[in-house]
Every structure is written in C-alpha cells, then in structure tokens.
C-alpha cells in the first residue's frame, strides 16, 4: 500500500474496464469498487464500447481483456494511441504464448496474467497510473 500513499498522495486512480465476459466484468468491477485507491468510471463489453466511453470520459488507466470482442486488444490499443487523452492500458489474459510481448509491442503499459493474485493485479494498475511499465 505504500505505493499509493507515497506517490499519489491519496488521489484515486480513475479507471475503465473492458471485458466481453459479463461474469468477469462484474467480478472485476466489484474488486475496483471496493478498493479506495481506485475510482471505477465505466465498464464496456466490447472494444468499440470501450473506445466510445473513454473518449467521452477520460480516465488514467484502462484495463482490457486482450480478447475484447470485435476489435480485440491489439487493434483497440492501436486506435487509442492516436488519441491525445488516451488512458495508459493494462492488458490481462492467459499467460500463454507471446501475448505479453504482443501487448507491449501494441503499446500497452502493462500486462497481468489471469493467474496472478488480485493484489498483484491492483498494484500493476497503480504502477501503470504512475507512468511505469509492468509486464508480469
């Protein structure tokens, strides 16, 4: 918790979630809503929905499933990179193959495997909000 206290001085990190699985989206929403370090602004079930919302309601961090329906993670990151107020993105997915490398190459600021602990996931989001790149 020192990362939050020392570097953000108590300001909440604004965040948006994107996942096509309603169960995952609900579970992740609850995790972020219960953590006072974050302010969950919106959720989206598709890449297009995420893009539309993040353009209307800028946030510091976007957390997306690599396999977000329609555009997918790589294309969504590519589109967002061209936007002046785009959030820093954390991608999460199964840690198989070269997804972490692909996420980094696409321009994501972080990657978290679905097998990581909740606390590690949250700490990655905090670090990314502070400008760090984290690929676990």
Where in this protein do the model-derived segments appear?
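Acidic, metal-coordinating helix/loop segments flanking the phosphotransfer/catalytic sites
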Residues: 43-61
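Active-site residues of response regulator receiver
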Residues: 64-67
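Non-catalytic signal-transmission and effector/linker regions of two-component phosphorelay proteins
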Residues: 1-14, 24
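A short, hydrophobic beta-strand element within the central beta-sheet of small alpha/beta folds
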Residues: 86-96
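Acidic catalytic/metal-coordinating carboxylates
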Residues: 46, 72-75
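C-terminal output helix
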Residues: 98, 116-129, 133
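Short amphipathic alpha-helix used as the core "switch/output" element in two-component signaling
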Residues: 74-85
């Amino acid at each position: 918790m020192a990362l939050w206290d020392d570097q953000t001085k108590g300001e909440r990190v604004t965040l948006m979630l994107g996942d096509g699985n309603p169960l995952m989206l609900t579970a992740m929403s609850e995790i972020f809503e219960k953590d006072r370090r974050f302010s969950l602004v919106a959720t989206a079930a598709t890449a297009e929905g995420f893009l539309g919302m993040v353009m209307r309601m800028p946030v510091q961090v976007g957390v997306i499933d690599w396999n977000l329906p329609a555009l997918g993670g790589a294309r969504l990151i590519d589109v967002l990179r061209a936007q002046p107020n785009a959030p820093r993105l954390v991608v999460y997915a199964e840690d198989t193959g070269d997804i972490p490398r692909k996420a980094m190459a696409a321009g994501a600021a972080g990657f978290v495997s679905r097998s990581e602990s909740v606390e590690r996931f949250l700490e990655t989001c905090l670090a990314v909000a502070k400008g760090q790149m984290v690929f676990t």
